[in-house]
Amino acid sequence: MRSDKIKKGVEQAPARSLLHATGQIKSPGDMDKPFIAICNSYIDIVPGHVHLRELADVAKEAIREAGGIPFEFNTIGVDDGIAMGHIGMRYSLPSREVIADAAETVINAHWFDGVFYIPNCDKITPGMLLASVRTNVPAIFCSGGPMKAGLSAHGKALTLSSVFEAVGAFKDGSMSQEDFLDMEANACPTCGSCAGMFTANSMNCLMEILGMAVPGNGTTLAVSDARRDLIRESAFHLMDLVKKDIRPRDIITKDAIDDAFALDMAMGGSTNTVLHTLALANEAGIEDYDLERINDIAKRVPYLSKIAPSSSYSMHDVHEAGGVSAIVKELVDLGGAIHPDRITVTGKTIRENVADAKINNTDVIHPKENPYSPVGGLSMLFGNIAPKGAAIKVGGVDPSVQVFKGEAICFSSHDEAVEAIDNHTVREGHVVVIRYEGPKGGPGMPEMLAPTSSIVGRGLGKDVALITDGRFSGATRGIAVGHISPEAAAGGPIALVHDGDIITIDLPNRTLNVDVSDEVLEERRKELPKFKAKVKTGYLARYTALVTSAHTGGILQIPEDLID
């Protein structure tokens, strides 16, 4: 066993003494059992994580029943909704790397035989995923699960995105204070990840088709007994993985990454999943995975399930309608959309996992014969503003908008843009350009949920577009193009756009262009000032120095002279 490194031999007597002191070694035979890490992310200020201590206790009990010795450790978490719109958001994406590094550190320092990961919210799941393929120790994931949708006094289903959009409506005078406060109080009624197909739930759904979590992981409610049952089931599967020495890199292959994007297309997941899945491919050693490949997948996968913020349906509605398994079963039956014979943590293939799945509500999950769209709900755009690509959640765009042409109004920060939207400087026909908010420029590639929500909340969702080298919350909808790469801070051409330039967003042709000649853009480049980092000390300064643009997944790049 891997853990023999710390518990076998005369030389490890001091280590054994310390292990006895933990209280986890309850009999002499325990030293002969697999040591299983529980990588938890319990934290009181994140509603998606307040119940994870309880879930870890369920996992510990099941691991002991299955013949392992559990050792729990914790990592950090950032709540993107609470960190939104201020300096806290600059720490959100960088927290992914902290989580990956922290988990790697504990797992490798203590030679665990297996790892049970318990994530839930936005950057925690991808951070743990990066750690799982980096350490490549047998592992399984079981998230904390989504919260229930809220309900307004008027009987309207609510999610967190409802509140963000209500801010714009209230500021604009189109919502009463009574309705505004009612929405604030009732949008998030339980613990769990936010109730729509936002980033957290998108990632937790993708875990099922990646093969790293059991069916039900993405949609089973946080407050349900079924969530505890999933934890127990996952613990027993993990012990089988340890026994058979099946590792994350055996499961997360190039085909698995393809299938993750296929499910993403079918369910209209968050654009943040693109960032995280590209980073996962890089960490897993999968070469030549680019945005064009994602577009190729989108062209062969139909859009089957439109969930909040793109509709009023919540994750619980998806669960009741058949869950992720029902969507995946449609893709299996479609033929050629995914690779269904890959192995998963259950010991079965994707095909076997979903063999008995069916759609229970065709309003929530459309059958493959009647999709929302014959192509996927995410799209990668290319053009002279985004030569390395950009991302848009086309499932969140009004279907009447296929091509948007408008006049650029440019801002060098999130806050400048929000102020201009609030004071009505931004008007119909504008393309709001927010740059220097990418991974390096932000730093941390903050989410632009406040400006997009204000635009939609004011009823301008079809009349104003927003493009940025920053990113969006999974709660974003409207004509919102993010992840523009290279970013402005890396000299990307988004930095060369001027007020009044005409920008065209062409969804059918997947292009994003400014109507300015290459010669003019090169002249403008000569006048472009050198980027200066906004943060000079601490973690964000180190992050700025190492991070790359969105087309890589926003990974940290080790200087070549250190690895040659």
Curated annotation (Swiss-Prot):
Catalytic activity: (2R)-2,3-dihydroxy-3-methylbutanoate = 3-methyl-2-oxobutanoate + H2O; (2R,3R)-2,3-dihydroxy-3-methylpentanoate = (S)-3-methyl-2-oxopentanoate + H2O
GO biological process: isoleucine biosynthetic process; L-valine biosynthetic process
UniProt record similarity statement: Belongs to the IlvD/Edd family.
The organism's place on the tree of life at top rank: Bacteria
Record-listed E.C. numbers: 4.2.1.9
Pathway stated in the Swiss-Prot or TrEMBL entry: Amino-acid biosynthesis; L-isoleucine biosynthesis; L-isoleucine from 2-oxobutanoate: step 3/4; Amino-acid biosynthesis; L-valine biosynthesis; L-valine from pyruvate: step 3/4
Highest classification ranks of the organism: Bacteria, Bacillati, Bacillota, Bacilli, Bacillales
Principal EC category: lyase
Cofactor: [2Fe-2S] cluster; Mg(2+)
Protein name: Dihydroxy-acid dehydratase
N6-carboxylysine: residues carrying this PTM: K123
Listed NCBIfam families: ilvD (TIGR00110), PRK00911.1 (NF002068)
Keywords: 2Fe-2S, Amino-acid biosynthesis, Branched-chain amino acid biosynthesis, Iron, Iron-sulfur, Lyase, Magnesium, Metal-binding
Ligand binding (Mg(2+)): D80, D122, K123, E447
HAMAP family to which the protein is assigned, alphabetical: IlvD
Active site residues per record: S473
Residues that coordinate or bind [2Fe-2S] cluster: C121, C194
Gene field: ilvD
Species annotation: Listeria monocytogenes serotype 4b (strain CLIP80459)
CC per GO annotation: cytosol
Note describing how the cofactor binds: Binds 1 [2Fe-2S] cluster per subunit. This cluster acts as a Lewis acid cofactor.
Assembly and interaction partners: Homodimer.
Pfam families membership: ILV_EDD_C (PF24877), ILVD_EDD_N (PF00920)
GO molecular function: 2 iron, 2 sulfur cluster binding; dihydroxy-acid dehydratase activity; magnesium ion binding
Role noted for this protein: Functions in the biosynthesis of branched-chain amino acids. Catalyzes the dehydration of (2R,3R)-2,3-dihydroxy-3-methylpentanoate (2,3-dihydroxy-3-methylvalerate) into 2-oxo-3-methylpentanoate (2-oxo-3-methylvalerate) and of (2R)-2,3-dihydroxy-3-methylbutanoate (2,3-dihydroxyisovalerate) into 2-oxo-3-methylbutanoate (2-oxoisovalerate), the penultimate precursor to L-isoleucine and L-valine, respectively.
